[in-house]
């Protein structure tokens, strides 16, 4: 058992873990919360849960590690602010949802509960029965304000935030990342609206892919030429088809769903949301990709080789997956935006690229290369709420062969990154 998991010993059921907004969420509509430094938490969708439980072994290094299931409810703190608190599931004897499937993560890697204060452990508090009645007027006003903020977010498709040189980047973004706060507030709103009928939800625990980076730069790409699942209503399917037709999804099988990148030249973080991503032309998509790998001073060329290597391997893996369809799934590309002295000069960057290729097999973690002198870079698939394959017995539609739309998007991505690499002089 790794030290990260060994630290989380069995905890009495009266304890809960305070869930916080995940400040590096740049896309998607599902609320992603921070469980602890290395673990995230998101609402359990049966289809996505089934995907992680039956995940093919060769795909594990391209997805976040699955860590189990918890029960989440909202409660008030001392200042009457609403908080989301996670608890172990009933009957799990302190361990977070043991899974018996042989294709899953080993039981030894599933999270256990602890009293360690740094994990934000709270005592259980009873939720006031009259909460809805007391706060109805107040919450109505907040809801109206929230709608105004979301409309502003749609209009402000690209935002900049100046990062202080001293201090932790995650703590600075805690109350700023617009997309993260939007998703968190929407989740609270949904749970509050159902307060009379339900105050207990299942969430899944997943690896925090950004935890190893000091200044995470994150690119969220919506993959494939089709986004709607087989179970989508006619209205939903038509809406998703329209979005694909009006974006780069229909042309190259991929579009920008969100971006967070550090501009070292100005000391700012740039955020790009999905509304801007939908408007990009193919050339605009290429420029956005170039911007993601550019730190405001120079192109991070030492990252391009490792990214291409990972994309090529992922493509080969998916070509072997029979009947899978990853509708509406995203692909994350992550690297550290922190400047490193040895990559300031172009000649140094070229040398580091050679080093990164030589040390590619010395990967740390699931699939994050950590070459000498260069930032590690990660490529992972996420969001499987609409994924299907013949293993899912309840599905009425069974597809044959590989997911051609997703693979087409991967090949387009490989081609564009290759173009950027060649045009930059490599």
UniProtKB/Swiss-Prot annotation:
Described function: Converts inositol hexakisphosphate (InsP6) to diphosphoinositol pentakisphosphate (InsP7/PP-InsP5).
Lineage, uppermost ranks: Eukaryota, Metazoa, Chordata, Craniata, Vertebrata
Ligand binding (substrate): 222, 236-243, 386
Pathway as given in its UniProt record: Phospholipid metabolism; phosphatidylinositol metabolism
Annotated family: Belongs to the inositol phosphokinase (IPK) family.
Record entry for activity regulation: Inhibited by flavonoids, including myricetin, quercetin, luteolin, isorhamnetin, rhamnetin, kaempferol, diosmetin and apigenin.
Catalytic reaction list: 1D-myo-inositol hexakisphosphate + ATP = 5-diphospho-1D-myo-inositol 1,2,3,4,6-pentakisphosphate + ADP
InterPro entries membership: IPK (IPR005522), IPK_sf (IPR038286)
Name the UniProt record assigns to this protein: Inositol hexakisphosphate kinase 2
Main location: nucleus
Enzyme class: transferase
Residues annotated as binding ATP: 207-209, 220, 383
Gene Ontology CC: one annotated term: fibrillar center
Signal peptide (residue range): none
GO molecular function per UniProt: ATP binding; diphosphoinositol pentakisphosphate kinase activity; diphosphoinositol tetrakisphosphate kinase activity; flavonoid binding; inositol 5-diphosphate pentakisphosphate 5-kinase activity; inositol hexakisphosphate 5-kinase activity; inositol hexakisphosphate kinase activity; inositol-1,3,4,5,6-pentakisphosphate kinase activity
Gene3D superfamilies: Inositol polyphosphate kinase (3.30.470.160)
EC number(s) per entry: 2.7.4.-
Organism whose genome encodes this protein: Homo sapiens (Human)
Any matching Pfam family: IPK
């Amino acid at each position: 058992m790794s030290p990260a998991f060994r630290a989380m010993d069995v905890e009495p059921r009266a304890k809960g873990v305070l869930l916080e907004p995940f400040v590096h969420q740049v896309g998607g509509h599902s609320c992603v919360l921070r469980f602890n430094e290395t673990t995230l938490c998101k609402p359990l969708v049966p289809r996505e849960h089934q995907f992680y439980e039956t995940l093919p072994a060769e795909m594990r290094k391209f997805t976040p590690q699955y860590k189990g299931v918890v029960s989440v409810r909202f409660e008030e703190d001392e200042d009457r602010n609403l908080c989301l608190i996670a608890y172990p599931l009933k009957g799990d004897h302190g361990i977070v949802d043991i899974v018996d499937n042989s294709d899953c993560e080993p039981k030894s890697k599933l999270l256990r509960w602890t009293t360690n204060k740094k994990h934000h452990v709270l005592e259980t508090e009873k939720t006031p029965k009259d909460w809805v009645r007391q706060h109805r007027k107040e919450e109505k006003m907040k809801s109206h304000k929230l709608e105004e903020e979301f409309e502003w977010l749609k209009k402000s498709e690209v935002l900049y935030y100046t990062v202080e040189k001293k201090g932790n980047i995650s703590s600075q973004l805690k109350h700023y990342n617009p997309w993260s706060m939007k998703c968190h507030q929407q989740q609270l709103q949904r749970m509050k609206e159902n307060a009379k009928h339900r105050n207990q939800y299942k969430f899944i625990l997943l690896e925090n892919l950004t935890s190893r980076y000091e200044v995470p730069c994150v690119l969220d790409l919506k993959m494939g030429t089709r986004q709607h699942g087989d179970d989508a209503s006619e209205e939903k399917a038509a809406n998703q088809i329209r979005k694909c037709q009006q974006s780069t999804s229909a042309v190259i099988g991929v579009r920008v769903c969100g971006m967070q990148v550090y501009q070292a030249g100005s000391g700012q973080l740039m955020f790009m949301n999905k509304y801007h991503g939908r408007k990009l032309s193919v050339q605009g998509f290429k420029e956005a990709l170039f911007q993601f790998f550019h730190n405001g001073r120079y192109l991070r060329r030492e990252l391009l080789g490792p990214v291409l290597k990972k994309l090529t391997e992922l493509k080969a893996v998916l070509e072997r997956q029979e009947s899978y369809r990853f509708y509406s799934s995203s692909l994350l590309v992550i690297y550290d935006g922190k400047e490193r002295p040895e990559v300031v000069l172009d000649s140094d960057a070229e040398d580091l690229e050679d080093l990164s290729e030589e040390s590619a097999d010395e990967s740390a973690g699931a699939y994050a290369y950590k070459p000498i002198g260069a930032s590690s870079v990660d490529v992972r698939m996420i969001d499987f709420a609409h994924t299907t394959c013949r293993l899912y017995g309840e599905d009425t539609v069974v597809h044959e062969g590989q997911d051609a739309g997703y693979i087409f998007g991967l090949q387009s991505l490989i081609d564009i990154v290759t173009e950027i690499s060649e045009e930059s002089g490599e």
